[in-house]
């Protein structure tokens, strides 16, 4: 991954910095997954608000909601602690759930949506700029693939092809979901909704139940990225320790 690439290109310390930057990037995203998970769960089943901690920009933070994220974090951590095989099985199941719900959403948008919901196709440069700023974040995490190369039962020469293919597939998936959201509901529903994608699916299918089904698919997506970042972060630290760039205790495989 980034550690080996940086080491061969620039030497020891750039490789250390690249590895630590990658690990902290994974940690940052993994920290975001917790609140995202509890928000999604709250859409499906309302979480009781108990034990107010503080408020941030008008939004209250409660112990009960935080506990949901903490429990999910412990489960994901345990799966990764058990080993790569268990994490891979979990990843496969969650990815299947995400794809299934996404295909239902896309099919519903294509057959029941209305083209006029997409108008105006363009407004001003502000909207374009906002999306452009978000796009790089959508592609964070694909370097987990080379990080896990040592545990993949795949010829090393095929890994670059898998990486490029996964990025292209993700780009197509993002575009498909944007299309489905745009054509499934008018702008008023999308802009005023709590979670626009779920609200668009509920509107298109004519029942709030479908919004909850959409969120279940989103939860699968959150769990896959959460699992992937923990897996990738652990492998980055292992690579650094194995190269004597971090304490050797991190290079031990239990």
What are these regions (language model features)?
Residues 1-7, 11, 43-50, 164-227, ...:
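TM-loop-TM module centered on a large, flexible mid-protein loop between adjacent transmembrane helices
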Residues 2-3, 142-146, 198, 234:
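Interfacial helix-capping/hinge residues at the ends of transmembrane alpha-helices
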Residues 8-13, 150-159, 165, 241-247:
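Juxtamembrane helix-boundary/capping and inter-helix hinge elements in multi-pass membrane proteins
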């Amino acid at each position: 991954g980034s550690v080996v690439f940086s080491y061969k290109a620039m030497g020891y310390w750039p490789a250390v910095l690249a590895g630590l930057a990658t690990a902290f990037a994974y940690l940052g995203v993994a920290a975001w997954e917790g609140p995202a998970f509890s928000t999604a769960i709250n859409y499906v089943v309302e979480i009781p608000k108990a034990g107010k901690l503080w408020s941030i920009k008008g939004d209250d933070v409660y112990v009960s909601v935080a506990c949901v994220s903490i429990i999910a974090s412990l489960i994901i951590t345990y799966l990764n602690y058990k080993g790569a095989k268990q994490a891979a099985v979990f990843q496969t199941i969650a990815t299947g759930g995400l794809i299934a719900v996404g295909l239902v959403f896309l099919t519903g948008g294509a057959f029941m949506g209305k083209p006029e919901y997409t108008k105006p196709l363009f407004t001003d440069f502000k909207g374009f700029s906002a999306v452009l700023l978000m796009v790089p974040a959508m592609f964070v995490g694909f370097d987990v693939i080379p990080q896990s190369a040592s545990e993949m039962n795949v010829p090393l020469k095929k890994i670059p092809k898998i990486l490029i293919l996964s990025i292209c597939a993700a780009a197509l998936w993002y575009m498909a979901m944007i299309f489905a959201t745009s054509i499934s509901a008018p702008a008023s529903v999308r802009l005023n909704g709590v979670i626009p994608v779920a609200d668009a699916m509920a509107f298109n299918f004519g029942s709030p139940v479908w919004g909850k089904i959409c969120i279940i698919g989103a939860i699968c997506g959150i769990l896959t990225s959460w699992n992937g970042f923990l897996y990738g972060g652990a492998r980055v630290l292992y690579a650094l320790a194995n190269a004597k760039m971090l304490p050797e205790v991190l290079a031990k495989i239990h």
